[in-house]
Amino acid sequence: TEGPYFYIPMSNATGVVRSPYEYPQYYLVYPAAFAVLGAYMFFLIIFGFPVNFLTLYVTIEHKKLRTPLNYILLNLAVADLFMVIGGFTTTIYTSMHGYFVLGRLGCNLEGFSATLGGMISLWSLVVLAVERWVVVCKPMSNFRFGENHAIMGVTLTWAMGLACTVPPLVGWSRYIPEGMQCSCGIDYYTRAEGFNNESFVLYMFVCHFSFPLVVIFFCYGRLLCAVKEAAAAQQESETTQRAEREVTRMVILMVIGFLVCWLPYASVAWYIFTHQGSEFGPLFMTIPAFFAKSSAIYNPVIYICLNKQFRQCMLTTLFCGKNPFEEEEGASSTKTEASSASSSSVSPA
């Protein structure tokens, strides 16, 4: 059922469909489902805010972390905080009421904040992959990665994020409640006259999903080849084999993290867009949307907490200046010293 600035995934033959801006949507799913949604968002806030905020705090406290290669990791933490503060808190409030109680303006603000955080996070992963490829594989022999390049990378993520999130505010597509109607996203559901949704959805899939996916696969594929070549050149010693396994594991985690975050959402959105009028339940889009939002937790774990340097500094901060695991960390890093150039450049290892 399509209405002014909303789309309910349910036929109105019985006359029960109501505007998600004005009435509870308990006819879509059981009221308990809204409580589960609110609890899940609370879980994301409780875990997502501290780990991302701690990343920023630890970087401010430890000067050795303020290197150009780490700028993009900080940007990733900022993007995740943007999602937590601008999107998750709103969804908790609306799920408690069972509908998008904040109205049309609130929908625009929530949709913009959550989508901007998600897009900046996505493009941060792209820039991170490119930076690692440039540093490890050295496609430009005389190139030296510096602060200006890092700032350019961060600026690119915000520019691409805004290029995706501003158009729906000015008439190219729009933000509408989605799934259980408690959070807002880009309109993949309708071809409403005057909004040019078709062209915007194609633009999103080509420029903000397919292209980033190709870049990430290319960069990490080349990086794995470079690490294997370096290990072979050192005659496959135990230390180089261990470093190679670590880098391979981290690359696989990075790619899986990206796919888990964005592939379900993109696939379902594309299906809905290409099957206009087909029947689907409210959970059909709700679950993939919150797969994407859960990246606020597992992005920091993959890219920051598993980074040896960040992890050591984080433990030092948490334990008031002393890392109780310092001996183990030091022993581990000594064992892989022979291949530190390759593994540290990949960074999350």
From Swiss-Prot:
Segments on the Extracellular face: 1-33, 94-107, 171-199, 272-283
* Transmembrane residue ranges: 34-58, 71-93, 108-130, 150-170, 200-221, 250-271, 284-305
InterPro entries to which the protein is assigned, alphabetical: GPCR_opsins, GPCR_Rhodpsn, GPCR_Rhodpsn_7TM, Opsin, Retinal_BS, Rhodopsin, Rhodopsin_N
Q: Does the keyword Protein biosynthesis apply?
A: no
Positions with an attached lipid (S-palmitoyl cysteine) read: 320
Q: Where is this region: Disordered?
A: 326-349
Query: Member of which family?
Result: Belongs to the G-protein coupled receptor 1 family. Opsin subfamily.
Summarizing the function annotation, the protein's role is: Photoreceptor required for image-forming vision at low light intensity. While most salt water fish species use retinal as chromophore, most freshwater fish use 3-dehydroretinal, or a mixture of retinal and 3-dehydroretinal. Light-induced isomerization of 11-cis to all-trans retinal triggers a conformational change that activates signaling via G-proteins. Subsequent receptor phosphorylation mediates displacement of the bound G-protein alpha subunit by arrestin and terminates signaling.
Name it.
Rhodopsin
Name the gene for this chain: rho
